[in-house]
From Swiss-Prot:
UniProt name for this protein: Venom peptide La1
Lysine amide: residues bearing it: K73
Subcellular location: Secreted
Pfam families for the chain: SVWC
Family: Belongs to the scorpion La1-like peptide family.
Post-translational events: Contains 4 disulfide bonds.
């Protein structure tokens, strides 16, 4: 695959990033101390406080717009 990283069903070229809309994640292939590394960003896990609820992110939206949001009264 040349200079790239593999993230599940994605091949990410070195220095580029790919959004996984199905799993709401962002993958970036970087050169870290002469080794390829895959940086992965996903939605944060939240603990809801009283009076708060989660609102789903945009269906099919790119990361981070696909992440759920917390709204409180």
């Amino acid at each position: 695959f040349g200079e790239s990283c593999i993230a599940g069903r994605f091949i990410v070229p070195l220095g580029q990033q790919v959004t996984d809309q199905r799993d709401c994640a962002l993958y970036k292939c970087v050169n870290y101390n002469k080794k390829f590394a895959l940086e992965t960003k996903r939605c944060a896990t939240v603990n809801l406080k009283s009076g708060c609820k989660t609102v789903p992110g945009g269906a099919g939206a790119a990361f981070p717009s696909c992440c759920p949001m917390v709204t409180c009264k």
